[in-house]
Amino acid sequence: MSASGKKPGTKGTKRHRKITSCRECHRLKLKCDRVWPCENCKKRGIPNLCPNGILVSVSDKLIKLLLSRIDTLQNCVKSVSPNHESLIVSSDDQKIIDDIYEKFGEKPAEDTKDENRSQPIHDPDHPTLEDVAQMLGKLKVGSHGYFNYYGASSSRSCIPQQDPNSEEEDTFMQRPFLYPASSYNSALHWSHRIPNILNPSTLCDMLPVPQFAVRLMGLYFDNVGWSSHIIHRPSFEEACLNLYSAAPDRTNPQPQFLSLTYMVFCLGTLFTSPVLVRNRYSLAHEFFLRAQLCFDISVSGFTPSLDSVVAVMLMAQYSYFCDRLERTNFAWNCIGLAIRLAVAMGLHRDGEVFELSAFQLHMRRLIWSELLFFDRMLSMSLGRPFAISNDQTNVHEPSNVCDIQISSQSNCIPDPSYERTEASFTIFKAKLSKVIASVLDRAFRFTPPSYSEVEALTEQFKVLENELPDYMRISRDTPNLPPMVIIEQYSAKFLIQQALLYLHRPWFVRAATRKEEREHYKSSFNLCTSVSHELIHNLYSLMCLVPVEPLRWWVFRFHSLNAGIIQAAYALCFPNTDYALTAYNDLQYICRIFEHLKGGFMFSNKDYDFLIQLKSKVFNRFQLSSQGLTPEDLTEDVPFLHFNVPSSRPNSKSPDDSSMRAEKAAQLDGLGLSSDDLNTAQSENLPIYEQENPLLFDSLSWHVPKDDTRNDKSPLVPTWNADMMFEEEQKPIVPIDLSSMQDDQVSSLTTNEEFDPLSSFQASHSGSNFWTNMMNEMGIPK
């Protein structure tokens, strides 16, 4: 036996050793103190596992869970049973999906022996329910009439992710840069006088007295509301009077509605009597500044709502009565902002798909129709592309219902009336706006369109005019109607005539300036001449029937100005024809009308000066023609409307040869100006429409010294009388086709006992002999 105690030649047996560490310390290779629970397990917070337990890590749990779900998913895929548990949606949602599939899903065709039975085929031209849902987008409706619209193509990162239970509204913008001097400076106007001016309650206390407020609201709806029906009068009057409530529980007014209220007061003040208001222009601008301040209070001023859109539209209308705002393109910026606000609240989508109330649906359609019309008329006047095309909106036309027939408690929109309502004029403008959009789209193309497109658009205008209801047509009973109805009837006629002039004006220029193309475009030449003549005399008839103040609508200015320019262009090109004297009388006529219309307003002063200069140039042309000079000798001296004139060249640039430059230099020298002062003279002295369209007018070549004999301080009278402005021999000559009239009518006209421009013009256009003779004088064959 050895010293170790083992027998020699035998293996030693292992003895049972004591536990040296717990299982967790052994797994982590930590030194264990062998006191249960050990110190390491106590520090790790697992004393209950010591000494025999082991901790499974979180990562191991996730991996095992993932593996188990993968196995379950593989089994479900291999299984043919559709009743397996879904891993993506819950069981309740799966039941809803199955129900929808049973109702709307495409089912396999049933077996039938009838071979003639056709199978349902999916038509790509007819979108499915899923396609329509993808196009609509989503509309969020909040408290106080706030809306937010997000299209289906919008990025989720652009949509504010807020608590759905929160009452906080989404905002659209932070600061309105409407014109260079931003409107937030309007707060400084009262900061030194009124403390806490940025509080809506303070601005509410600054409202005029209730009696004056009621008077201003009446003046607005009588003189401005007819031009754009964007305010529901009963609801607005009720809400406006609630601002004067002295109830202790009265809530703070919304800044958007305060801005709208102040703009109604602003436009109503422009039509007040001088006896009631000493300086109405100053007071109107004060209301305008308060409206801007309400609009800019905090970020709530740009929360998309109907009140904010209407307030901005009224600001654009007011800018045409303020010379300072008109120079800064304020209306253009306002309408652009209003369209963005309207699109942000989904006005370009018909509200019926969003299940809105009848009142909200009706007002949204009215406001959107008026906004589109305003934008497109502004595009015509400034020569800029419009904002929204017809293909980007699906809003239906408003219903022809009275304001008193619908309210916020109405369950449905009443049946449309067959008589005239407050919405009738808006419905007509909505129909006309669609055709005007096609005209503008053609006008702003970079490639010259075909003349067949112009003829097709002309037919659309004729169809629209023929489909006018009886209450929108000028008739013999028109003088007996209320003033607002008379203005609407004449305005419908004016709008169609102006759109026709805008459409055919480029072709009129080509027919007048190019002899080789005169035969091809004689229809446009004839149309522009006759329509402009009719428009001027219709404006005269309207001024004889209604007060002057409502006629200061900015659209009338553009209508009559364009017609006067076309008549002047004819007289400059063909001074030896019989119609040239009539064209000159029309130009003189429109100058006197503008002198009478401008009154105390500044918006027509520049147009009046421009027409006076043009009339002087036509008069000089007549003097040169009387001395034996032929029109061909003076063709290069005649400026024309080259804007949007189709050209065979790809870049349609106006000619600028050495003779024209020398002529301009001579004219500038006669005015006491140098060529370096050209840009300054154009920017300071030209009207806004000439600054925006340098190719549309050539005012420097038309510039003549002002006529000092004219009286700029013409009295303001309720209605207009031609005897106040013309002598008997100065009244305009109306071309009349005597061959198409009876003997008694001819005798009454030759005696010149009474002049009725409406009836005389209708008589002059009863036949085509007059215009045929005029074309023969110009050398145009039949």
UniProtKB/Swiss-Prot annotation:
It holds the Pfam family Fungal_trans. GO terms for biological process: DNA-templated transcription; regulation of transcription by RNA polymerase II. Keywords: DNA-binding, Metal-binding, Nucleus, Transcription, Transcription regulation, Zinc. PROSITE patterns: ZN2_CY6_FUNGAL_1, ZN2_CY6_FUNGAL_2. Residues 105-126, 645-665 are annotated as: Disordered. This is Uncharacterized transcriptional regulatory protein C1F7.11c. Residues 22-50 bind DNA. Signal peptide: none annotated. Residues 654-665 have a biased composition (Basic and acidic residues). It is found in: Nucleus. It comes from the Eukaryota. It comes from Schizosaccharomyces pombe (strain 972 / ATCC 24843). GO terms for cellular component: cytosol; nucleus. InterPro entries: Sec_Metabolite_Reg (IPR050613), Transcription_factor_dom_fun (IPR007219), Zn2-C6_fun-type_DNA-bd_sf (IPR036864), Zn2Cys6_DnaBD (IPR001138).
